[in-house]
Amino acid sequence: MMNPKRLSVPRLLTPVALAITLAACSSGPKTPTSVDITLEPTLSVQNYMINADSSEGSLQADWLIMAAKAALQNGDLAQADLLIKRLARMPLSEVQQAEWQLTRAAYHLKLNQADNVIELLNFKAWWKLPNEQWKDYYTLRVEAYTALQQPFEANRQLVTLSQYVDESQQAEIAQQIWANFTGYSQYEITQLHPDASEEVLDGWLQLAIYMKTMSANVPQLKNTLEHWFAENTAHPAALYTPAEIQSILDLEIVQPVHTALLLPLSGKYAKQAQLIRDGFIFAMMNDKDRDPEATLKVIDTNLYQPHQLKQQLTDEQIDFIVGPLRKDVIEVLQGELSDDSGQVSIPSLALNIPDELQTGTGICYLTLSPEQEVAQAAKHLFANGYKYPLIFAPQGNLGQRVVSAFEAEWKKYSTNKVAVSYFGDKRQLQRDVNSVFGLQESQQRIAQMEGLMKLPMETQPRSRRDIDSVYIAARSSELTLIKPFIEVAVNPDAKPPKLFSNSMSNSGEKQYEDLTGIVYSDIPMLLEVNPALDSQMEQLWPDQSNFQKRLQALGMDAYKLMAELPQMKVVPNHAVNGQTGVLTIDDQCVVHREISWKEHGAL
């Protein structure tokens, strides 16, 4: 009888162990077989590289693209550059080529090489790509043209980009297109020319041209905009209308019919008030478009108490007030006419600026403010390249106000300290000038040295050299003395500072002393030629001084602003050419006047 074969235990376990080992190997982590390269990277560069090393062909290219995107995301530009160059040597599908171009463009943007983006980011029109890639394509081109300061080209890309974004982003794109167009000047925007096929872009451009070129005539602008929107109901601007345009469309242009002019026609300020009144009525009589039903009630504020004024305004059905002139009367009358919210019942243009302004009251403010004039001087000096100004002002309250206004405005543009000096009466002018230019200190130092050395020194006092401009707030009689004192105080071998002055120096009287070379500011009516206006005023008011003419000009501008203020409140930066300057308003409805400049002795 044969014994049955005995199975060897080691031989039995060997195949079992092998099977277990193979099973263990097959259950380890696997490299993914696909990846969406249009998504943002979620893994590290190292992880993407591991996947790329364990893949080949098209899948390997996908992993390398994601690795390059991850490197850019982490700010590792050197690694991103290596991967971009490696991908350039590989065969890529259309989608891969697109994503590689996008990654390369993003890399150049991070290096501030926007011109390279425009050159290298160039999808083919026949490529069949997902919308996400086209969206990224136009987004990057927008960023590149914006960096190159080419807003019109950026708008071209934005218009096309709008085809690939959802509705929630359409309003943002429309806002960006409009913002780009508003950055152009009136001249620049008329030089832009879309292609014939760019109807959407052309529509945006046309609206921008209307807003830039017709802003001086808001009623005409409103009518033009209404016609455009009626004919272009499907344009993005009709769906996402810019707030600036909407404010014009919503504007109800109502001109005052019954106006009250409130002035202190008796008492201390009677002469000033009468000149303002004359200018106001002069402008009204020259207004060919004036409503034949319009009325004007001139009221002497010194003859009535505030509550009486209020009653008279009500009885006369006044719908617009010009004045008062005095600050205290403005404040009291504002209280009489205000409701619980502080809003006045009758819109007004006050002819002075109270010390404390309240916003949203319905009152605007126009005045010939010396502070406004001197603040513009600070801006003018800085704009013309002067860095170290000296302001020379009279002692007293006016001088302090002028200096404070100049310093406050100068600080907006420069950290350089303004040199300040106050002058007293005419007998002390030379001493004041020598003091501010450092001659007295220089003389004292020379005297000290001579005392120490017991010998006379062959030298002369030296003036300070850190002043490149002098703004002088002075009357013409004072300026004729100050100018030669400054010329003498400056050393012959030093470059003399440029001299500027305010409107007080332009009295209109014949100058017997030489003021040649001093640049001064004043209202346009006194510096710009207007034969028709000059002839009219000379016939009505012969031998008027410049001081009187400025007050008459204030009255003229007050009349003009009655019609312009509604537009100025809704049209950003809307400017009006007035007799006292180019007029604009700020958030508190204070009228600012851009004055003119001229040089004494200039032809």
Swiss-Prot record:
Residues 1-24 form the signal peptide. It is a lipid-anchor. GO terms for molecular function: enzyme regulator activity. A lipid is attached at C25 (S-diacylglycerol cysteine). One of its GO terms (cellular component) is periplasmic side of cell outer membrane. InterPro entries: LpoA (IPR007443), Peripla_BP_I (IPR028082), TPR-like_helical_dom_sf (IPR011990). One of its GO terms (biological process) is regulation of cell shape. It holds the Pfam family LppC. Keywords: Cell outer membrane, Cell shape, Lipoprotein, Membrane, Palmitate, Peptidoglycan synthesis, Signal. PROSITE patterns: PROKAR_LIPOPROTEIN. It is found in: Cell outer membrane. A lipid is attached at C25 (N-palmitoyl cysteine). Regulator of peptidoglycan synthesis that is essential for the function of penicillin-binding protein 1A (PBP1a). Interacts with PBP1a. Belongs to the LpoA family. This is Penicillin-binding protein activator LpoA. It comes from Vibrio vulnificus (strain YJ016).
